[in-house]
């Protein structure tokens, strides 16, 4: 198949390109700068996609995968450029489209959403989940993000054209080497600093959300892009087993070879910098059963390998700027000394994780 990947040189894109090329597809990458040795590339700015319409349409791609769509305006431009020239569009969306995400952030009134979320679960009624200051921060990391960032309008545009079929993939929190958000860093910094324990507010400790390793997420994208059964469909992409934050923290710490304790604290004994920002009674777990059942998706990289690769990269590539307010060790030492506030403890190295029914089961971290 002839596949055009828009934005193929960032965190996820190169892995998508690799998966497609390894499967024998003819891939062209449209991006701003050549950061990788692509077999075929077109240099340009996706913020002005229409300026490159002639070159892009001349490719006559079977599928266009847009890795960096951030607004309805961008999605509308994408559809207009490729209508009549491509056979299908594939857009990367996010699990933040669900109403549950709005409840989590305190932006949606009403009851909690039941989980796991499926592709039919209610979407947010309020657009633009993130405040302007958060968008500004994200734009410093992701240069392709525009001021109108919201994946709900993106999905409407991609799935709303009668002539050009679209596929939408709702991605999880993606981790792996090259993660510009450094999701593992707060845990690994404490380990590197010799902390005896990692502390979590009890609500944070129990909370769970969708995750995916970057190579596995890329594999799902490549699969959906090259399987005609995916036309017109929406798919959640996430690991099939979701760990609560306490267990996930222990997994990461174990992959780093750490021996210590992960402790869930009573709210009254939790330092201010560890207080949850949001309604953590609302879990964000999603089901990825549809893509597994319809397209036969399976993760090519096992969890233990994914964690080890990510830990190794993060230890070698810490962020350049660190918010030291996140690491108030004096306050954490005080909480450690208040054993009455310790509600649950996982000892990494001799670990038993509680299963969903509260029973103990062995786990390797």
How would you label these PLM feature ranges?
Residues 3-23:
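N-terminal Rossmann NAD(P)H-binding glycine-rich loop of SDR-like oxidoreductase domains
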Residues 210-217, 302:
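A conserved structural motif in NAD(P)-dependent oxidoreductases
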Residues 220-283, 288-290, 321-365:
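Mid/C-terminal beta-alpha module of Rossmann-like enzyme folds, strongest
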